[in-house]
Amino acid sequence: YKRQDYALPGFWDGRPDGQRWKYFRNNNFSHNTLSIDHKIQYANGEAFVCEEHTDAKQPSVKLDMTTLYKDQASSVFRTFKLLNDYTIEITDEVDLLSPQSIVSWIASTKAQVEVKENRVHLTHEGKHFYMEIIAPVGATFKTYPAKNTYKGEYPIDGYNMLEAECGLEGGKGKVVVRMSSKRNMR
């Protein structure tokens, strides 16, 4: 954050409908998380660990994020599973209140982004990182420059957004993304 951000009108207004959440850097659009129908998460919601398997061959942790999506979903769970020494899989299990709603898987990055349908190659300072959306079948990524959501915010320079918009059949399903330092994530 830049010092100027802290002086923005309502920056410290943390109520669910507060001005703070209209600023890009403070809401879920600038973080690696979900949005439903491109709406801001419920600010008074919480994510908490509801399951963990730290001693498993493929360790995992599951978060209950349901209260962050008040009035949008009846349940939202995110599981992080370490598949091997260089690959992690993120599974979002979502049960939408409206079957027509769209779940967007969003991430921001300073890396250069190359998208090929459901695969992404990130490069930054000579380092490489790979992502693949496994489910739902047919989901693809798109990329675009990050931009402010409210007039007066300090400019956002050098950040790219990565997004996959996913319709879930019957409003219930999974969004599964693998991330790895290796091109072959299997």
Tell me the role of every PLM-derived stretch.
Residues Y1:
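Conserved small/polar residues in nucleotide/adenosyl-binding loops
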Residues D5-R186:
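CBM-like, beta-strand-rich accessory domains located in the C-terminal region of large
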